[in-house]
Amino acid sequence: RLPEWLPLLHECFDTKRVVVSVDEELARIENIPRTGGVESDNVRMVKIREHGVRYEIDFSQGHKTGFFCDQRDNRRKFGLLAKGRNVLDLCCYTGGFSISAALGGAEEVTAVDLDENSVAMAKRNANLNQAKIKFTHADAFTWLRTMIENGRKWDLVIADPPKFIHGREDETGVAKYADLNKLALQLVAPEGLYVTCS
C-alpha cells in the first residue's frame, strides 16, 4: 500500500525524498520486501531540526530509522526537567536526551553508550548544538556497577536501552530490562528523578 500513499504524502507534507527500510524480521513475517515495495532515494546523512535542536541522522547505520521521532516531545520535556540538575543518559544513542538536557540548562550531563558509532554520532550532534556533554563508550551494565561502587549519584537519570526482547517468550531480554533499571535506580540522588523507556 505504501506505493499508493507516497504521492499523497508528498503532496500533504511537501516531502522531497523517500527512505524506506522495513525491519528484517517484520519483512520476513509479513512476506514483504525490506524496501516496502518502494524505491528509496540514496540518502545516508540528513540534518534535521526538532524543537530548535539540530541533529544529523545516519539512515544507513542507525538503528531502525536512525532517529526515534516518537520521542520528540519526551526529549523536550526531559530538557525542561534537566534545568540545574546533574544528568545521566544511559544508552544515549544519537544523544537526543543528553542534548536536550544540556540545552535545557543542566549543570552537567553524562552520556553512556556501548555502540562506538552511536557515541560518535552523539558527539557530532552535541557539537552541532554547542552542547557540553561528557560521553563515555562503555557497556551500561558494567559501567553502572562501577558507578555504584564509587558512590556516584545523579539528580536526573534516564535509561533508554535498545531492544532487548526479541520474542514473546524472551525471558533473558526481560531480565536485562529489570537489571538495567535496578542498577540505574541506585544512581538516583535523594529527591532525584528517574525516567525509563523501552
Where do the model's predicted regions map?
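Non-catalytic substrate-recognition/targeting regions of SAM-dependent transferases
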Residues: L2-F68, R76
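Conserved alpha-helix/loop element of class I SAM-dependent methyltransferases that forms part
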Residues: C69-R85
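Conserved class I S-adenosyl-L-methionine
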Residues: G84-Y93
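Conserved SAM-binding loop of SAM-dependent methyltransferases across substrates and taxa
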Residues: T94-E107
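Conserved SAM-binding motif I beta-strand of class I
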Residues: E108-D113
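S-adenosyl-L-methionine
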Residues: N117-I158
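Mobile active-site "lid"/loop adjacent to the S-adenosyl-L-methionine
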Residues: S118, W154-L183, A189
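Short glycine-dipeptide loop
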Residues: V188-Y194
